[in-house]
Amino acid sequence: MTKVTREEVEHIANLARLQISPEETEEMANTLESILDFAKQNDSADTEGVEPTYHVLDLQNVLREDKAIKGIPQELALKNAKETEDGQFKVPTIMNEEDL
């Protein structure tokens, strides 16, 4: 059985920005031990002659052909805009000069 210490659980909780009680820490340690023990079952699997795989499915970059298509006219694109300026959408400022 893999032993998970309270310190390890507290460290993981800290990394995850979680606040857990001492009772939860103990419970989490037991849960993590069970998970790690279950995962150790993979160590006993016979993988002799099994080719390593890097993806679950044997697919490679299934992409459509990149074709240029005609877009909509600028006037139609801007038709429902709340505000426009010089043929572009105008949006509220979210950063000031001092933020840069």
From Swiss-Prot:
Top-rank taxon, per record: Bacteria
Membership in a protein family: Belongs to the GatC family.
Keyword Metal-binding: no
Keywords for the protein's UniProt record, in alphabetical order: ATP-binding, Ligase, Nucleotide-binding, Protein biosynthesis
Reactions accelerated catalytically: L-glutamyl-tRNA(Gln) + L-glutamine + ATP + H2O = L-glutaminyl-tRNA(Gln) + L-glutamate + ADP + phosphate + H(+); L-aspartyl-tRNA(Asn) + L-glutamine + ATP + H2O = L-asparaginyl-tRNA(Asn) + L-glutamate + ADP + phosphate + 2 H(+)
Described purpose of this protein according to its UniProt entry: Allows the formation of correctly charged Asn-tRNA(Asn) or Gln-tRNA(Gln) through the transamidation of misacylated Asp-tRNA(Asn) or Glu-tRNA(Gln) in organisms which lack either or both of asparaginyl-tRNA or glutaminyl-tRNA synthetases. The reaction takes place in the presence of glutamine and ATP through an activated phospho-Asp-tRNA(Asn) or phospho-Glu-tRNA(Gln).
UniProt source species: Staphylococcus aureus (strain Newman)
Lineage: Bacteria, Bacillati, Bacillota, Bacilli, Bacillales
Pfam family, one: GatC
The protein's assembly and partners: Heterotrimer of A, B and C subunits.
One of the protein's GO biological processes: glutaminyl-tRNAGln biosynthesis via transamidation
Protein name: Aspartyl/glutamyl-tRNA(Asn/Gln) amidotransferase subunit C
EC number: 6.3.5.-
Keyword Chaperone carried by entry: no
SUPFAM superfamilies: Glu-tRNAGln amidotransferase C subunit
Any one Gene Ontology molecular-function term assigned to this protein's record: ATP binding
